[in-house]
Amino acid sequence: MTYDPVASIIVPSYRGADRLPQLLDSLAAQNDGTPPFEVIVVVDGVDAGSVALLENESRLDVRSIVFPENRGRVAALNAGFEAARGDVLIRCDDDLVPAVDYVAAHVSAHRDGPGGVIGLYLNEYSATSYAEVYGKDADQRFRRDAYSSAPAVVWRYWAGNCSITRQIWEAVGQYDPEYRLYGWEDVDYGYRIHMAGFEVRLAPDLETPHRVAAVTTAIRARRASHSGAARRLFERKHPHAGLPNAIPGWSLWNALVRGLSRIPLKPARLGRAVDALLRVLPRGVGRKLVALSVESAALGGYRSPHSAKERF
């Protein structure tokens, strides 16, 4: 294809051979009349299945950038954005299932001027005790809180379904490579858009199904720990961002969170124990145990940021 795309979709992908087919199918099924777009998939570490899939993709204007070794999400995002040719730059993580009007809606959202546009996730869970006891309810609370947020703090929801114009990319620059592991590279970017004077807003019509990876307490707690560590980096870089206090105030519940966060127990190990108990505990008790595991893991990661060592 030789046309200049209106939009570029940047897809960072790590071990995504099982996720990419549904994403590519969804992008290939965009409505007739969709503005021309390209897809740039950055394979973060050689993944033979992903590479073969992309080499055989003929329905889309798709390009692949392949890192020989895993370099992390920030490096993948920056490589994809730098290679993009479109004016509207869409970050679309490889576990999303875009609707048939996805590209058109992202493009349309920028017609009134440059800004940052966020579509929240519609998380889809496999059938696990964690999802039924905690995950689905937590998602509802998250979405409710997001839509009730003041415009000045919407940047906090910048994540894996968002778009900017080339003007913003050139003004704000790359994702910050100091976020080498999991989490907060996206929040950091949303904040920088906001601080550059551009509006960041939520677009309800861009809510997109998301095949969520954190389907157990063990996975969720492990990610919470890494996210807590990354938050510490964000606060060091942006001390005036006005985030709520990461260390909770004093209450019986918060005393439990504080105490558990100090115990040298790997979050995933604690999470696995909770997952086993969820099968037999009353729902309310199970919900509290999951919350305690997740909140204490996040606080533990925040207090000991150097303990985070994994990439996702």
Predicted segments with their positions:
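Conserved donor NDP-sugar-binding/catalytic core segment of glycosyltransferases
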Residues: 101-133
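Short, acidic, metal-binding catalytic loop of nucleotide-sugar glycosyltransferases
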Residues: 25-36
